[in-house]
Amino acid sequence: IIYHGYCADREEAAVRSAEAGVDIDMMTGIYCENLCRLVREGKISEDLINESCMRILELKNKLGLFENPYKDADETKEKEVILCKEHRDLAREAARKSFVLLKNEEKILPLGKEKKIAWVGPYVHSRNLMGSWSFIGDAKDVTNLEEAVKAQADTTNMSFHAGSPMLGSDIRLEGFGEAMEQSTTPEEEEAMLLEAVNAAKEADVVVLAIGEDRLQSGEATSNANIRIPEIQQRLLERVSKVNENVVVVLFNGRPLDLRDVVSKAKAVLEVWMPGTEG
């Protein structure tokens, strides 16, 4: 409400939020920093604070948190339940049902088993598929695209290539207490691109796994340019020039301008940030 111009500063935000009935400040520390002083200065009613406290205490009582403050937290149970086969199967099914086929020209999908396929793009190997708010998710638990393909199909006639970095050289993204750094030289980028182009020339079909990094979506990530990263646009351009049978698998967490993608691909499959089993 400060950034949107409703309040001038953190103190005013504390007053207006409390008066509006917001009982808990989960993230900012604004209540902790200001409420006691504001009560002492007479800028906010102590009765109002007491009412908020009572609502919080009543909720905790209903949830049984006074008798068992840690509720279902159990390290042994967590090891048995988190990432168990049943949950991974559900995660895979949820991902599958979320995919959207945006284009399928000449019914190029599904791909025939006899096809020679080049899997190309930064998302062929990336495990960062969980989205911006998956705080305790660990990328090492994610099945990436190459692993998934090799687990399900005969890969004799397949090859796997990064084609480009996710964003380009000397890039740093920060968000949600995380950071992603990338540093590649122009020579390294050209070598990756050339390898992918050569593979595309030899393939019947190119599956191009491209999109935005997970930290490009979420809070405070507005961008004047909502196309796929420039270096991946270059990859799409070069690959589509040597092979007209391009299938794009698109990874992203927000709406994108896909006009360039759609014009150069025979099929486009939107898979979002598909999660652990995506």
PLM regions: where:
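Short acidic/histidine-rich active-site segments
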Residues: 1-12, 16-18, 23-29
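C-terminal non-catalytic regions of proteins with extracellular/luminal or membrane-system context
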Residues: 1-10, 32-46, 58, 81, ...
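Long, well-ordered, tryptophan-enriched scaffold segments
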Residues: 21-22, 28-69
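Flexible, acidic loop-helix segments that line cofactor/substrate-binding pockets
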Residues: 67-87
